[in-house]
Swiss-Prot record:
Residues 1-204 are annotated as: Precorrin-2 dehydrogenase /sirohydrochlorin ferrochelatase. This is Siroheme synthase. It comes from Salmonella paratyphi A (strain AKU_12601). PANTHER family: SIROHEME SYNTHASE, SIROHEME SYNTHASE-RELATED. The active site is at 248 (proton acceptor), 270 (proton donor). Keywords: Cobalamin biosynthesis, Lyase, Methyltransferase, Multifunctional enzyme, NAD, Oxidoreductase, Phosphoprotein, Porphyrin biosynthesis, S-adenosyl-L-methionine, Transferase. The modification Phosphoserine is found at residue 128. Pathway: Cofactor biosynthesis; adenosylcobalamin biosynthesis; precorrin-2 from uroporphyrinogen III: step 1/1; Cofactor biosynthesis; adenosylcobalamin biosynthesis; sirohydrochlorin from precorrin-2: step 1/1; Porphyrin-containing compound metabolism; siroheme biosynthesis; precorrin-2 from uroporphyrinogen III: step 1/1; Porphyrin-containing compound metabolism; siroheme biosynthesis; siroheme from sirohydrochlorin: step 1/1. The keyword Transmembrane helix does not apply. The gene is cysG. Its EC number is 2.1.1.107, 1.3.1.76, 4.99.1.4.
Amino acid sequence: MDHLPIFCQLRDRDCLIVGGGDVAERKARLLLEAGARLTVNALNFIPQFTVWANEGMLTLVEGPFDETLLDSCWLAIAATDDDTVNQRVSDAAESRRIFCNVVDAPKAASFIMPSIIDRSPLMVAVSSGGTSPVLARLLREKLESLLPQHLGQVARYAGQLRARVKKQFATMGERRRFWEKFFVNDRLAQSLANADEKAVNATTERLFSEPLDHRGEVVLVGAGPGDAGLLTLKGLQQIQQADIVVYDRLVSDDIMNLVRRDADRVFVGKRAGYHCVPQEEINQILLREAQKGKRVVRLKGGDPFIFGRGGEELETLCHAGIPFSVVPGITAASGCSAYSGIPLTHRDYAQSVRLVTGHLKTGGELDWENLAAEKQTLVFYMGLNQAATIQEKLIAFGMQADMPVALVENGTSVKQRVVHGVLTQLGELAQQVESPALIIVGRVVALRDKLNWFSNH
């Protein structure tokens, strides 16, 4: 280990930055956030330094480097564009046993600045020891996506409860189990983020009054239409925290690779026209695993509340008193249309969009008269097997036979394929496509020739 990671208490302590440009400004911002009493020494200053000085946040010393400014300092940063000046700052600091950072010159520095993930009071620092700042930045960005923005609020609130926890729970084991429940409670975290004091207090009292045995819960997560990059940050956080993930065929392998490695996985294989596991049995799997005290993620393609039967699954949990929450996802209509160059609405062609299931309960019938109306876009989910009927009904109820149509197979994935034509060809086009696929009907489909971007990459 070439560098010892430490966190410095700089509040109300003298620090010096030599340099008045953009790099110095970024370093100054960090030191000011840490509460340092800051002096900045440079020949010239960018405007932000003058703003800070006028607000009394720091002291500016205009002119060449003055090493006597180091005499009262705890820490220094050399951030000029002159290597000779930077080395002088480093040498002067070294002779006074003051830690000094030299920007872009780690070998000349006695300390280096890490990439920081700030969820104060929780802080995470990432460093490559100065060998690869870009790698450190990329790792920081990845960690940023994994750590919720409200984590700092949760940590601060935990600090307020420490005395009460210590008083109520006699052993370290009991306290540990309480904190484990506390920090994974999504309802508490969301209430803190929303500054909902009433909900925070209610959830806190429930945590203190419940048995310490972990209470199970279910999180319904929308995985999006295929591309793993379209999974939401909150969705990623949830699958990283799951004890067990119950998923179906529409969830891509790339997304499943993001699931916590030691989480159990249950494949239920749902797709239109074929249910590897009946819906009622899926409901019971969720209920059973949650009753064991597990954190269950039900991972569904697209958005769980748009033709995903998510509402039915949650009704079962609600009836049994199992806590649940929902993380929405990008629905297939939005993702597939965007990746196909087909805007769902357009000022000239469509003032509304309808999401329609082509997979009806026995005896069900759609409102074909309204579906055949002008100036709208229709998106049919699970409609491949009914494509010929959709074609026949729309024409029978007045839709023009030359209405553009598109079928998007494996939308947003590297296997995406789009076939398009006009309404009179819909039944025939459906024979060329395999599930999962989406049917889009409307004048906006004609824009695909101009707006298609994904297949060109």
